[in-house]
Amino acid sequence: MTVPHFLTLFDLPADEIRQLVRRAIDLKALQRQGKIYEPLKNQVLGMLFEKSSTRTRVSFEVGMIQLGGNAVFLSPRDTQLGRGEPLEDTARVLSRMVDCLMVRTFSHSMLEHFSAYSQVPVINALTDSYHPCQLLADIQTYFEHRGDIQGRTVAWIGDGNNMCQSYINAACQFDFQLHIATPAGYGPDPAILQMARERVQIIAEPREAVRGADLVVTDVWTSMGQEKEKHRRLQDLADYQVNGELMSLAKRDALFMHCLPAHRGEEVSAEVIDGPQSVVWDEAENRLHAQKALLEKLLIGGPL
């Protein structure tokens, strides 16, 4: 039997990933009502971190606990990976001891290699190429505030990084238009763009990209592992800050999202991220609920 992994948004059919978002909304409501729902009793999630994170660790760990299961945190110092054990051996061993594996790492090809040797589902909790769990939370947040995102326009401003590339995938899976504004040399992977030609436009000027948008999204200009490039990146991306002037060109009821952590005064101004159009705190919380829906789907096939 094929093991169901979740490495990109394309690992689930469009109708199932849409159902997953709606299920996340239902699970959030259950929790708010104080109802106990523990379908994952006696199941264990192994959490393998090469890149540190606040939101990823807490949301997955709390999510498993709320669903009745448990989670085990593993950093490179906690495994033999840090001492040269082959990746495939680690995958084989861990997948005999836990029911699901969540991996947050740098190389997407490494994650693909790891998952090929795992006997249990592997979840991409972030690679340098994609961040699909965050997109589940983002789409859930849009659904909650504005309804279905199908047919809407999303503007991505800034670095064409893993979040941008996951938005490209989301444009295909959720059927919306995506405008991407990045400086020269900072665009997303052309091969990823090629898959979504009908739904994605590259627009050099940020003002044109956000004009009429329903949702404006950005991310940090310097990702983990790029610290040596920070000074150059700040200069190159200086004209791509999401501020009040830029947001005024989007629709009057447009939302602003950022996966956090944010750097006020760099990729976004304080007036925007702390303003009335910002839904970043709901977006952050929804990592918990979206990932609970994902764990339920991968481990038991859906709601009991």
Swiss-Prot record:
Pathway: Amino-acid biosynthesis; L-arginine biosynthesis; L-arginine from L-ornithine and carbamoyl phosphate: step 1/3. L-ornithine binds at residues 162, 219, 223-224. It holds the Pfam family OTCace_N. GO terms for cellular component: cytoplasm. GO terms for biological process: arginine biosynthetic process via ornithine; citrulline biosynthetic process; L-arginine biosynthetic process. Reversibly catalyzes the transfer of the carbamoyl group from carbamoyl phosphate (CP) to the N(epsilon) atom of ornithine (ORN) to produce L-citrulline. HAMAP family: OTCase. This is Ornithine carbamoyltransferase.
